[in-house]
Regions:
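A short acidic/histidine/glycine-rich donor-binding loop in glycosyltransferase catalytic cores
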Residues: 252-258
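Nucleotide-sugar donor-binding catalytic core of glycosyltransferases
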Residues: 2-55, 62-80, 84-251
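C-terminal "capping" alpha-helix adjacent to the active site of nucleotide-linked donor transferases
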Residues: 259-269
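Small/polar loops that bind or transfer phosphate-bearing groups
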Residues: 214, 258-259
């Protein structure tokens, strides 16, 4: 079978795109992939340019347009072509109505998302187009770095009480406890000049921990940390959600499921 040709509409130069860049690199081993990141172009013009380069896509993969197209280019006229098209949606809690409109107006055939239960709860109208594409790790980064386990308890990332109530609870309960370390999200601002953990440094910091706490936000879905932490050979203590069983997470075997009431006792045990 000839290799498929996939046109990806995404702004890969964004720092937050590290995971997706790694995904595209892996995809490129199985298909011919071209990235388009220029804003405000007509799809017909793009296709003519690519045809001149002897590339005619079999499929167009559109990255999430949310946050004012911060991660994807504005491309016009997608609904006027008959090439199969898919869109990848991540933060489903934002711009929900716009997401439905985008699929409808651009005649999107498939909608990919890393969450299943949350997708069905949030965008039930699109369930027939839904394809589950869970988060994945680059094994060259998220692995056992064989570092000394000198952090007893680690919490990383955002901890706003409105969006991350469990992380906020952990932070309040564990702050001041010997062996507990908390690092803010790298994009929350850094006026104090603290060390920022991204890529390998992030994975290595996880690898130093014996126990890592996280949750799936107030919306209860598996964020990337559910995949990154076990890959770094660190015990994950986390809130459960409906996607985990299908993803292969087994309480007591490859992670420890907790509640607001028992996470501290489980960690101490």
């Amino acid at each position: 079978m000839p290799r498929r040709k996939i046109l990806v509409l995404a702004k890969l130069n964004n720092k937050r795109f590290m995971h997706f860049r790694h995904f595209i690199t892996e995809l490129g081993k199985h298909a011919d992939v071209v990235i388009w990141d220029k804003d405000r172009w007509e799809i017909g013009r793009i296709l003519r340019i690519l045809k001149g380069r002897k590339f005619s896509p079999d499929f167009i993969f559109c990255y999430d347009f949310a946050y004012n197209y911060a991660l994807a280019p504005r491309v016009y006229g997608l609904g006027s072509i008959n090439i199969p098209k898919g869109v990848y949606y991540i933060d489903l809690q934002t711009q929900t109505e716009e997401r439905k409109k985008y699929v409808r107006e651009n005649k999107i055939d498939l909608v990919f998302s890393p969450t299943k239960d949350f997708f069905h709860r949030t965008l039930p109208e699109l369930k027939d187009k839904f394809r589950w594409l869970p988060f994945s790790n680059n094994p060259d980064i998220f692995k056992d770095w064989h570092l000394k386990k000198d952090i007893d308890f680690l919490l990383m990332g955002r901890s706003w009480s409105a969006w991350y109530p469990f992380r906020n609870l952990v932070l309040k309960k564990m702050t001041g406890l010997k062996g507990f370390v908390y690092h803010k999200h790298p994009y929350e601002g850094n006026p104090e000049g603290r060390k920022v953990y991204i890529g390998e440094e992030y994975a290595k910091e996880i690898n130093r921990a014996k126990i890592f706490f996280t949750c799936g936000t107030k919306f209860n879905y598996p964020v990337r940390k559910y995949f990154e932490v076990p890959a770094c050979n660190t015990l994950l203590i986390a809130k459960g959600n409906k996607d985990l069983k299908e993803l292969g997470f087994i309480n007591g075997q490859n992670f420890v499921e907790c509640t607001d009431d028992n996470f501290y006792d489980l960690a101490m045990y």
